[in-house]
Amino acid sequence: MARKKEFRYRGYTFEELLNMSLEDFAKLLPARQRRSLKRGLSPEQKKLLRKIRLAKKGKYNKPIRTHSRDMVILPEMVGMTIHVYNGKEFVPVEIKEEMIGHYLGEFALTRKIVQHGSPGVGATRSSMFVAIK
């Protein structure tokens, strides 16, 4: 039976990532995410991080909702369910280890996938001569 492969981010195990400081973790990220962390967290992002830390301790019971789609997913967020706003509603996003280093907004799609129905009368040349019920 195949064993599940242990998760590693840039050669570091999840436990090592949890013990790293934010500055050390930022050095492992791609340039765009590293730049956004280097410039500092916005007040909304700091508020979100505070709520996540409270929820981990069990002191925040409500679902965590945020508009901060540009928040980089940090190792301390893993295991949480965060409701991310997509422009219309809050989409629940369960944070997994593989999501580390991505943005929250990547997992809450803003556009709906088109579900085309059957074409109407007159939609094609051949349907012009189909009798309407």
From Swiss-Prot:
Cellular component annotations (GO), alphabetically ordered: cytosolic small ribosomal subunit
Listed GO MF terms: rRNA binding; structural constituent of ribosome
UniProt KW Cytoplasm keyword: no
Keyword field: Ribonucleoprotein, Ribosomal protein, RNA-binding, rRNA-binding
Protein's UniProt keywords contain Cell cycle: no
Matches recorded under InterPro entries: Ribosomal_uS19, Ribosomal_uS19_bac-type, Ribosomal_uS19_CS, Ribosomal_uS19_euk/arc, Ribosomal_uS19_SF
GO annotation (BP), single: ribosomal small subunit assembly
Cross-referenced PROSITE patterns: RIBOSOMAL_S19
Superkingdom assignment: Archaea
Similarity comment text for this entry: Belongs to the universal ribosomal protein uS19 family.
Function: Protein S19 forms a complex with S13 that binds strongly to the 16S ribosomal RNA.
Protein name: Small ribosomal subunit protein uS19
